[in-house]
Protein backbone atom coordinates (compact mmCIF):
# COMPACT_ATOMS: atom_id res chain seq x y z
CA UNK A 1 0.00 0.00 0.00
CA UNK A 2 1.12 3.52 -0.80
CA UNK A 3 0.20 6.41 1.53
CA UNK A 4 0.76 9.90 0.22
CA UNK A 5 1.30 13.12 2.14
CA UNK A 6 -1.76 14.90 3.63
CA UNK A 7 -2.98 17.89 1.59
CA UNK A 8 -1.03 16.70 -1.46
CA UNK A 9 -2.13 14.64 -4.44
CA UNK A 10 -2.21 10.94 -3.58
CA UNK A 11 -3.02 11.37 0.12
CA UNK A 12 -5.22 8.82 1.87
CA UNK A 13 -8.31 10.49 3.28
CA UNK A 14 -10.92 9.54 5.88
CA UNK A 15 -14.24 11.31 6.36
CA UNK A 16 -15.75 11.22 9.86
CA UNK A 17 -19.54 11.41 10.05
CA UNK A 18 -19.71 12.63 13.61
CA UNK A 19 -16.95 14.48 15.43
CA UNK A 20 -17.35 13.60 19.11
CA UNK A 21 -14.71 12.19 21.45
CA UNK A 22 -14.57 8.86 19.64
CA UNK A 23 -14.09 10.66 16.34
CA UNK A 24 -11.39 12.82 17.90
CA UNK A 25 -9.37 9.77 18.92
CA UNK A 26 -9.81 8.30 15.44
CA UNK A 27 -8.66 11.59 13.91
CA UNK A 28 -5.56 11.61 16.13
CA UNK A 29 -4.69 8.05 15.12
CA UNK A 30 -5.26 8.91 11.46
CA UNK A 31 -2.98 11.95 11.77
CA UNK A 32 -0.27 9.71 13.23
CA UNK A 33 -0.58 7.46 10.17
CA UNK A 34 -0.19 10.40 7.81
CA UNK A 35 -3.80 10.40 6.66
CA UNK A 36 -5.88 13.39 5.68
CA UNK A 37 -8.86 13.90 8.02
CA UNK A 38 -12.19 15.56 7.27
CA UNK A 39 -14.65 15.96 10.16
CA UNK A 40 -18.42 16.53 9.98
CA UNK A 41 -20.95 17.27 12.69
CA UNK A 42 -24.19 19.17 13.21
CA UNK A 43 -22.44 21.79 15.38
CA UNK A 44 -19.19 23.73 15.06
CA UNK A 45 -16.11 23.19 17.23
CA UNK A 46 -16.92 19.52 17.88
CA UNK A 47 -13.95 17.59 19.34
CA UNK A 48 -12.68 15.88 16.17
CA UNK A 49 -12.78 19.20 14.31
CA UNK A 50 -9.93 20.39 16.55
CA UNK A 51 -7.57 17.82 15.01
CA UNK A 52 -8.91 17.55 11.44
CA UNK A 53 -7.53 19.12 8.27
CA UNK A 54 -11.00 20.34 7.29
CA UNK A 55 -14.43 20.49 8.86
CA UNK A 56 -18.05 20.82 7.74
CA UNK A 57 -21.07 21.73 9.83
CA UNK A 58 -24.03 19.91 8.28
CA UNK A 59 -27.26 18.14 9.19
CA UNK A 60 -26.26 14.51 8.74
CA UNK A 61 -29.89 13.44 8.58
CA UNK A 62 -30.01 15.34 5.27
CA UNK A 63 -28.92 12.91 2.54
CA UNK A 64 -28.06 15.67 0.08
CA UNK A 65 -25.71 17.31 2.59
CA UNK A 66 -23.77 14.08 3.14
CA UNK A 67 -23.59 13.30 -0.58
CA UNK A 68 -22.43 16.83 -1.42
CA UNK A 69 -19.51 16.66 1.02
CA UNK A 70 -18.51 13.17 -0.13
CA UNK A 71 -18.64 14.25 -3.79
CA UNK A 72 -16.40 17.21 -2.97
CA UNK A 73 -13.89 15.37 -0.76
CA UNK A 74 -13.91 11.90 -2.38
CA UNK A 75 -12.56 10.12 0.73
CA UNK A 76 -10.93 6.70 0.76
CA UNK A 77 -13.09 5.72 3.74
CA UNK A 78 -16.30 7.10 5.24
CA UNK A 79 -16.53 6.35 8.98
CA UNK A 80 -19.83 6.66 10.86
CA UNK A 81 -19.22 7.87 14.43
CA UNK A 82 -22.75 8.69 15.66
CA UNK A 83 -26.32 7.42 15.35
CA UNK A 84 -27.94 10.49 13.75
CA UNK A 85 -26.96 9.79 10.14
CA UNK A 86 -29.07 9.29 7.04
CA UNK A 87 -28.12 5.68 6.37
CA UNK A 88 -29.92 5.56 3.01
CA UNK A 89 -27.36 8.09 1.77
CA UNK A 90 -24.58 5.76 2.94
CA UNK A 91 -26.12 2.84 1.06
CA UNK A 92 -26.28 4.94 -2.12
CA UNK A 93 -22.70 6.14 -1.72
CA UNK A 94 -21.48 2.60 -1.15
CA UNK A 95 -23.28 1.43 -4.30
CA UNK A 96 -21.41 4.17 -6.17
CA UNK A 97 -18.05 2.79 -5.09
CA UNK A 98 -17.25 4.63 -1.86
CA UNK A 99 -16.04 2.59 1.11
CA UNK A 100 -18.33 2.94 4.13
CA UNK A 101 -16.85 1.53 7.34
CA UNK A 102 -17.74 -1.07 8.43
CA UNK A 103 -20.37 -1.14 5.63
CA UNK A 104 -23.56 0.80 4.97
CA UNK A 105 -26.03 -1.97 5.80
CA UNK A 106 -24.25 -2.72 9.08
CA UNK A 107 -24.44 0.95 10.08
CA UNK A 108 -28.15 0.99 9.27
CA UNK A 109 -28.88 -2.23 11.18
CA UNK A 110 -26.87 -1.30 14.28
CA UNK A 111 -28.51 2.09 14.67
CA UNK A 112 -32.04 0.65 14.72
CA UNK A 113 -32.86 -1.34 17.87
CA UNK A 114 -35.81 -3.12 16.29
CA UNK A 115 -33.93 -4.28 13.19
CA UNK A 116 -30.92 -5.19 15.32
CA UNK A 117 -33.01 -7.34 17.67
CA UNK A 118 -34.58 -9.13 14.70
CA UNK A 119 -31.11 -9.70 13.29
CA UNK A 120 -29.66 -11.05 16.55
CA UNK A 121 -32.57 -13.02 18.01
CA UNK A 122 -34.41 -14.18 14.92
CA UNK A 123 -31.69 -14.51 12.28
CA UNK A 124 -28.66 -15.47 14.36
CA UNK A 125 -30.69 -17.14 17.16
CA UNK A 126 -28.60 -15.43 19.84
CA UNK A 127 -29.82 -15.36 23.45
CA UNK A 128 -31.46 -12.02 24.34
CA UNK A 129 -33.93 -10.67 26.86
CA UNK A 130 -37.61 -11.27 26.08
CA UNK A 131 -38.91 -8.47 23.87
CA UNK A 132 -41.80 -7.08 21.83
CA UNK A 133 -42.20 -4.20 19.38
CA UNK A 134 -44.87 -1.49 19.55
CA UNK A 135 -45.70 1.85 17.91
CA UNK A 136 -48.61 3.31 19.89
CA UNK A 137 -49.82 3.43 23.48
CA UNK A 138 -52.20 0.47 23.18
CA UNK A 139 -49.55 -1.74 21.62
CA UNK A 140 -47.07 -0.71 24.31
CA UNK A 141 -49.56 -1.64 27.04
CA UNK A 142 -50.11 -5.07 25.50
CA UNK A 143 -46.37 -5.59 25.11
CA UNK A 144 -45.70 -4.65 28.74
CA UNK A 145 -48.39 -7.08 29.93
CA UNK A 146 -46.94 -9.85 27.77
CA UNK A 147 -43.35 -9.23 28.86
CA UNK A 148 -44.30 -8.63 32.51
CA UNK A 149 -43.36 -5.94 34.98
CA UNK A 150 -40.88 -4.44 35.53
CA UNK A 151 -39.88 -3.91 31.90
CA UNK A 152 -37.90 -1.42 29.82
CA UNK A 153 -39.13 0.77 26.98
CA UNK A 154 -36.50 1.95 24.47
CA UNK A 155 -36.90 4.06 21.31
CA UNK A 156 -36.29 2.44 17.95
CA UNK A 157 -33.39 4.86 17.46
CA UNK A 158 -31.62 7.07 20.00
CA UNK A 159 -28.11 7.88 21.12
CA UNK A 160 -26.56 5.65 23.76
CA UNK A 161 -28.73 5.25 26.85
CA UNK A 162 -31.20 8.01 25.97
CA UNK A 163 -34.89 7.17 26.21
CA UNK A 164 -34.49 3.99 28.25
CA UNK A 165 -37.44 4.06 30.66
CA UNK A 166 -38.15 1.53 33.39
CA UNK A 167 -41.85 0.73 33.92
CA UNK A 168 -43.07 -0.95 37.10
CA UNK A 169 -46.86 -0.98 36.62
CA UNK A 170 -49.52 -0.61 33.94
CA UNK A 171 -50.60 2.83 35.18
CA UNK A 172 -47.20 4.26 34.22
CA UNK A 173 -46.99 2.85 30.70
CA UNK A 174 -48.45 5.82 28.77
CA UNK A 175 -46.17 8.33 30.48
CA UNK A 176 -43.15 6.04 30.05
CA UNK A 177 -43.89 5.61 26.35
CA UNK A 178 -44.12 9.37 25.81
CA UNK A 179 -40.87 9.89 27.73
CA UNK A 180 -39.11 7.22 25.69
CA UNK A 181 -40.10 8.52 22.25
CA UNK A 182 -39.24 12.08 23.27
CA UNK A 183 -35.60 10.94 23.00
CA UNK A 184 -36.04 9.23 19.62
CA UNK A 185 -33.94 10.11 16.59
CA UNK A 186 -36.15 11.23 13.71
CA UNK A 187 -39.94 10.91 13.72
CA UNK A 188 -40.36 7.24 14.62
CA UNK A 189 -42.80 6.36 17.40
CA UNK A 190 -41.76 2.71 17.43
CA UNK A 191 -40.22 1.22 20.56
CA UNK A 192 -38.89 -2.07 21.81
CA UNK A 193 -40.28 -3.33 25.13
CA UNK A 194 -37.76 -5.55 26.91
CA UNK A 195 -37.75 -7.85 29.89
CA UNK A 196 -35.99 -6.17 32.81
CA UNK A 197 -33.23 -8.41 34.13
CA UNK A 198 -30.95 -8.01 37.11
CA UNK A 199 -27.60 -7.18 35.56
CA UNK A 200 -24.66 -8.69 37.39
CA UNK A 201 -22.24 -7.06 34.99
CA UNK A 202 -21.84 -6.00 31.37
CA UNK A 203 -19.15 -6.75 28.84
CA UNK A 204 -18.03 -5.09 25.65
CA UNK A 205 -16.29 -7.42 23.23
CA UNK A 206 -14.35 -5.37 20.70
CA UNK A 207 -14.40 -7.41 17.51
CA UNK A 208 -12.58 -6.29 14.39
CA UNK A 209 -12.25 -7.27 10.76
CA UNK A 210 -9.27 -6.51 8.54
CA UNK A 211 -7.71 -7.44 5.21
CA UNK A 212 -4.85 -9.92 5.55
CA UNK A 213 -1.90 -9.93 3.17
CA UNK A 214 -3.67 -12.64 1.15
CA UNK A 215 -6.62 -10.19 0.82
CA UNK A 216 -8.98 -12.43 2.79
CA UNK A 217 -10.90 -10.77 5.64
CA UNK A 218 -10.03 -11.96 9.14
CA UNK A 219 -12.24 -11.47 12.22
CA UNK A 220 -10.69 -11.27 15.69
CA UNK A 221 -11.89 -10.44 19.19
CA UNK A 222 -10.07 -8.62 21.98
CA UNK A 223 -10.07 -9.62 25.65
CA UNK A 224 -13.51 -8.47 26.93
CA UNK A 225 -13.92 -5.12 28.67
CA UNK A 226 -16.17 -4.99 31.74
CA UNK A 227 -18.37 -2.06 32.65
CA UNK A 228 -21.45 -0.97 34.56
CA UNK A 229 -24.00 1.66 33.58
CA UNK A 230 -25.88 2.90 36.65
CA UNK A 231 -28.22 5.05 34.54
CA UNK A 232 -28.05 3.39 31.10
CA UNK A 233 -25.01 5.40 30.02
CA UNK A 234 -21.30 4.70 30.28
CA UNK A 235 -19.61 5.79 33.51
CA UNK A 236 -16.63 3.49 33.98
CA UNK A 237 -14.99 0.46 32.41
CA UNK A 238 -12.05 -1.78 33.20
CA UNK A 239 -9.82 -4.10 31.25
CA UNK A 240 -9.42 -7.04 31.48
CA UNK A 241 -12.76 -8.27 32.76
CA UNK A 242 -13.00 -10.17 36.04
CA UNK A 243 -15.63 -12.66 34.81
CA UNK A 244 -14.80 -16.35 34.42
CA UNK A 245 -13.00 -17.72 31.39
CA UNK A 246 -16.14 -19.61 30.38
CA UNK A 247 -18.22 -16.41 30.32
CA UNK A 248 -15.51 -14.66 28.31
CA UNK A 249 -15.40 -17.43 25.73
CA UNK A 250 -19.19 -17.44 25.35
CA UNK A 251 -19.24 -13.65 24.98
CA UNK A 252 -16.45 -13.72 22.41
CA UNK A 253 -18.28 -16.40 20.46
CA UNK A 254 -21.43 -14.25 20.32
CA UNK A 255 -19.43 -11.21 19.23
CA UNK A 256 -17.57 -13.11 16.52
CA UNK A 257 -20.84 -14.42 15.11
CA UNK A 258 -22.36 -10.91 15.06
CA UNK A 259 -19.36 -9.28 13.37
CA UNK A 260 -18.97 -11.98 10.74
CA UNK A 261 -22.65 -11.74 9.80
CA UNK A 262 -22.60 -7.92 9.65
CA UNK A 263 -19.41 -8.06 7.59
CA UNK A 264 -17.32 -5.21 6.31
CA UNK A 265 -14.11 -3.84 7.81
CA UNK A 266 -13.32 -2.20 11.13
CA UNK A 267 -14.29 -2.62 14.74
CA UNK A 268 -17.61 -3.53 16.32
CA UNK A 269 -18.38 -2.94 20.00
CA UNK A 270 -20.61 -5.87 20.95
CA UNK A 271 -22.43 -5.40 24.26
CA UNK A 272 -23.17 -8.46 26.40
CA UNK A 273 -25.29 -8.66 29.57
CA UNK A 274 -24.42 -11.18 32.30
CA UNK A 275 -27.44 -11.99 34.48
CA UNK A 276 -26.98 -15.01 36.73
CA UNK A 277 -26.19 -17.90 34.41
CA UNK A 278 -27.60 -16.07 31.37
CA UNK A 279 -25.19 -14.49 28.89
CA UNK A 280 -27.27 -12.25 26.63
CA UNK A 281 -26.60 -10.24 23.50
CA UNK A 282 -27.65 -6.63 24.09
CA UNK A 283 -26.53 -4.25 21.31
CA UNK A 284 -23.67 -3.60 18.91
CA UNK A 285 -22.02 -0.37 17.79
CA UNK A 286 -20.50 -0.32 14.26
CA UNK A 287 -17.50 1.71 15.45
CA UNK A 288 -15.20 2.10 18.45
CA UNK A 289 -17.15 1.90 21.70
CA UNK A 290 -17.27 4.43 24.53
CA UNK A 291 -16.34 1.74 27.07
CA UNK A 292 -13.33 1.01 24.86
CA UNK A 293 -11.72 4.32 25.79
CA UNK A 294 -9.95 2.20 28.42
CA UNK A 295 -7.87 0.62 25.63
CA UNK A 296 -5.97 3.92 25.41
CA UNK A 297 -4.28 2.75 28.62
CA UNK A 298 -4.68 -1.03 28.61
CA UNK A 299 -3.60 -2.14 25.13
CA UNK A 300 -0.62 -1.82 22.82
CA UNK A 301 -3.00 -0.95 19.97
CA UNK A 302 -6.13 0.94 21.00
CA UNK A 303 -9.58 0.51 19.45
CA UNK A 304 -9.35 3.76 17.47
CA UNK A 305 -6.12 2.80 15.74
CA UNK A 306 -7.57 -0.62 14.92
CA UNK A 307 -10.63 0.96 13.28
CA UNK A 308 -8.61 3.42 11.20
CA UNK A 309 -6.12 0.75 10.12
CA UNK A 310 -8.93 -1.54 8.99
CA UNK A 311 -10.74 1.34 7.26
CA UNK A 312 -7.86 2.01 4.88
CA UNK A 313 -6.91 -1.64 4.39
CA UNK A 314 -4.10 -2.08 6.92
CA UNK A 315 -3.88 -5.21 9.10
CA UNK A 316 -3.91 -5.59 12.89
CA UNK A 317 -2.81 -9.20 13.40
CA UNK A 318 -2.57 -9.03 17.20
CA UNK A 319 -3.61 -6.80 20.10
CA UNK A 320 -1.90 -7.26 23.46
CA UNK A 321 -2.92 -6.17 26.94
CA UNK A 322 -0.02 -4.22 28.41
CA UNK A 323 -1.51 -3.39 31.82
CA UNK A 324 -4.68 -3.71 33.88
CA UNK A 325 -6.46 -0.40 33.38
CA UNK A 326 -9.68 1.50 34.05
CA UNK A 327 -11.50 4.55 32.76
CA UNK A 328 -14.06 6.88 34.36
CA UNK A 329 -15.93 9.72 32.68
CA UNK A 330 -15.85 13.38 33.68
CA UNK A 331 -19.44 14.65 33.57
CA UNK A 332 -20.72 18.21 33.43
CA UNK A 333 -23.09 19.26 36.22
CA UNK A 334 -23.94 22.61 34.65
CA UNK A 335 -26.32 23.62 31.87
CA UNK A 336 -25.45 25.75 28.83
CA UNK A 337 -22.01 26.93 29.89
CA UNK A 338 -19.99 27.90 26.81
CA UNK A 339 -16.23 27.49 26.97
CA UNK A 340 -16.27 25.47 30.22
CA UNK A 341 -13.21 25.32 32.45
CA UNK A 342 -11.81 22.33 34.33
CA UNK A 343 -10.49 22.65 37.87
CA UNK A 344 -8.09 20.50 39.93
CA UNK A 345 -6.50 18.74 36.95
CA UNK A 346 -3.10 18.96 38.66
CA UNK A 347 -4.47 17.20 41.76
CA UNK A 348 -5.88 14.37 39.66
CA UNK A 349 -2.57 13.95 37.86
CA UNK A 350 -0.68 13.67 41.14
CA UNK A 351 -2.06 10.13 41.36
CA UNK A 352 0.53 7.77 39.80
CA UNK A 353 -0.57 6.13 36.57
CA UNK A 354 -3.40 8.59 35.90
CA UNK A 355 -4.02 10.34 32.58
CA UNK A 356 -6.72 12.93 31.92
CA UNK A 357 -8.24 13.36 28.46
CA UNK A 358 -10.45 16.43 27.98
CA UNK A 359 -12.61 16.27 24.88
CA UNK A 360 -12.87 19.99 24.13
CA UNK A 361 -16.65 20.13 23.79
CA UNK A 362 -17.67 23.79 23.48
CA UNK A 363 -20.74 23.77 25.71
CA UNK A 364 -22.08 21.84 28.71
CA UNK A 365 -25.40 20.32 29.58
CA UNK A 366 -26.12 18.27 32.67
CA UNK A 367 -24.33 14.92 32.63
CA UNK A 368 -22.66 15.61 29.29
CA UNK A 369 -19.45 13.63 28.93
CA UNK A 370 -16.66 16.22 28.90
CA UNK A 371 -13.60 14.06 29.43
CA UNK A 372 -12.28 10.77 30.72
CA UNK A 373 -9.77 9.70 33.35
CA UNK A 374 -7.56 6.72 32.53
CA UNK A 375 -5.33 4.80 34.92
CA UNK A 376 -3.15 1.72 35.01
CA UNK A 377 -2.43 -0.38 38.07
CA UNK A 378 -1.22 -3.74 39.29
CA UNK A 379 -4.87 -4.87 39.12
CA UNK A 380 -8.12 -3.54 37.71
CA UNK A 381 -9.23 -2.90 41.28
CA UNK A 382 -6.26 -0.61 41.87
CA UNK A 383 -6.84 1.14 38.53
CA UNK A 384 -10.54 1.62 39.34
CA UNK A 385 -9.70 3.13 42.70
CA UNK A 386 -7.41 5.63 40.97
CA UNK A 387 -9.89 6.73 38.28
CA UNK A 388 -12.75 7.06 40.75
CA UNK A 389 -10.65 9.24 43.01
CA UNK A 390 -9.23 11.35 40.17
CA UNK A 391 -12.59 11.91 38.46
CA UNK A 392 -14.18 12.98 41.74
CA UNK A 393 -11.51 15.67 42.16
CA UNK A 394 -12.04 17.28 38.74
CA UNK A 395 -14.75 19.95 38.51
CA UNK A 396 -16.34 21.31 35.34
CA UNK A 397 -17.17 24.99 35.71
Swiss-Prot record:
Its EC number is 6.3.1.21. Mg(2+) binds at residues 271, 283. It comes from the Archaea. Residues 118-312 form the ATP-grasp domain. One of its GO terms (biological process) is 'de novo' IMP biosynthetic process. It is an enzyme of class 6 (ligase). GO terms for molecular function: ATP binding; magnesium ion binding; phosphoribosylglycinamide formyltransferase 2 activity; phosphoribosylglycinamide formyltransferase activity. Coiled coil: none annotated. It catalyses: N(1)-(5-phospho-beta-D-ribosyl)glycinamide + formate + ATP = N(2)-formyl-N(1)-(5-phospho-beta-D-ribosyl)glycinamide + ADP + phosphate + H(+). N(1)-(5-phospho-beta-D-ribosyl)glycinamide binds at residues 21-22, 81, 290, 361, 368-369. Keywords: ATP-binding, Ligase, Magnesium, Metal-binding, Nucleotide-binding, Purine biosynthesis. Pathway: Purine metabolism; IMP biosynthesis via de novo pathway; N(2)-formyl-N(1)-(5-phospho-D-ribosyl)glycinamide from N(1)-(5-phospho-D-ribosyl)glycinamide (formate route): step 1/1. InterPro entries: ATP-grasp, ATP-grasp_carboxylate-amine, ATP_grasp_subdomain_1, PreATP-grasp_dom_sf, PurT, PurT/PurK_preATP-grasp, PurT_C. ATP binds at residues 113, 154, 194-197, 202. One of its GO terms (cellular component) is cytosol. Involved in the de novo purine biosynthesis. Catalyzes the transfer of formate to 5-phospho-ribosyl-glycinamide (GAR), producing 5-phospho-ribosyl-N-formylglycinamide (FGAR). Formate is provided by PurU via hydrolysis of 10-formyl-tetrahydrofolate. Belongs to the PurK/PurT family. PANTHER family: FORMATE-DEPENDENT PHOSPHORIBOSYLGLYCINAMIDE FORMYLTRANSFERASE (PTHR43055:SF1). Homodimer. NCBIfam families: PRK09288.1. This is Formate-dependent phosphoribosylglycinamide formyltransferase. It comes from Saccharolobus solfataricus (strain ATCC 35092 / DSM 1617 / JCM 11322 / P2) (Sulfolobus solfataricus). The lineage of its organism: Archaea, Thermoproteota, Thermoprotei, Sulfolobales, Sulfolobaceae.
Amino acid sequence: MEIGTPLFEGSKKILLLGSGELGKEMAIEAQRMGLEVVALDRYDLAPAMHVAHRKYVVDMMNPNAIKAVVKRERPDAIIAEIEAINTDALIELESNGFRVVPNANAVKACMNRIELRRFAAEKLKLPTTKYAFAENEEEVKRACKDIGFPCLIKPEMSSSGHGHVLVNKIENVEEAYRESISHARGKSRRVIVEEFVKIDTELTVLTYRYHSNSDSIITKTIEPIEHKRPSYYYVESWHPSNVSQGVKETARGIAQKVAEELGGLGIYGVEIIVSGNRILFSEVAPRPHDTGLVTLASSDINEFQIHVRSAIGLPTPEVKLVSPAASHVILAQTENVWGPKFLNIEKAMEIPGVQVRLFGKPVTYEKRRMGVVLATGNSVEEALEKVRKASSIILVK
